[in-house]
Design a protein with these regions (language model features):
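Conserved catalytic-core motifs of GNAT/GCN5-like acyltransferases
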Residues: 126-146
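Conserved acetyl-CoA-binding loop-helix of GNAT-fold acetyltransferases
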Residues: 84-101, 117-122
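A short, well-structured alpha-helix characteristic of acyl/acetyltransferase catalytic modules
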Residues: 1-41
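Short hydrophobic/aromatic beta-strand or adjacent loop that forms the aromatic wall/cage
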Residues: 47, 146-150
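Acetyl-CoA-dependent GNAT
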Residues: 28-73, 79-85
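Residues on conserved beta-strands of the protein kinase catalytic domain
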Residues: 72-74, 147-148
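Conserved beta-strand-loop-alpha-helix junction that forms the acyl-donor binding cleft
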Residues: 107-125, 138
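Short beta-strand-to-coil "C-cap" segments at the C-terminal boundary of structured domains/repeats
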Residues: 152-156
């Protein structure tokens, strides 16, 4: 279930800090920087931060922004704190379905090799979206190149 992230603010910070210097952080940031969300007590217009919870247990984090003038959702962030938990994917795709059905455009990025790629591909295909691949545009800590992938779904 998605709930306002401010309710789990400290716990989300600690979970992100546990992931510093990991491949998961590369998937979140798209670069080698370490990062954690700055969750505001009162979010700005168009900014959404959610804790993904099962029962009362924090299992993930989802964020995005909406430009209401352009009717577009973008700048998504997703982190699963409990790898393999199907509730994370279920809640995220439910929110994506809501956004796709109400907005003109939904776009998000992903680093190649992310385990969510297959699910993103299927979702994008189901909504007649596009997948753009920028070959070898990201370099990881081991020196290996990865693709930068952009998904877009545009409603008429």
């Amino acid at each position: 279930m998605l709930v306002p992230a401010v309710l789990y603010k400290e716990q989300i910070t600690k979970e992100f800090q546990k992931l510093y210097y990991t491949e998961d952080m590369l998937f979140e940031t798209g670069c080698l920087e370490q990062w954690r969300p700055e969750i505001e007590d009162i979010p700005n217009v168009g900014r959404f931060d959610y804790a993904i919870v099962s029962g009362n247990k924090l299992i993930g984090y989802l964020s995005y922004q909406i430009d209401y003038y352009c009717s577009a959702a973008y700048n998504f962030g997703l982190m699963s704190f409990e790898r393999g938990n199907p509730i994370v994917g279920k809640d995220v795709f439910k929110k994506l379905e809501e956004l796709v059905s109400t907005l003109h455009r939904v776009e998000w990025r992903m680093v190649g090799g992310n385990p969510a790629e297959r699910g993103y591909d299927a979702f994008c295909k189901r909504h007649n979206g596009n997948k753009h691949i920028f070959k070898d545009s990201i370099r990881d800590a081991k020196g290996d190149y990865r693709n930068d992938i952009v998904y877009e779904i545009v409603n008429p």
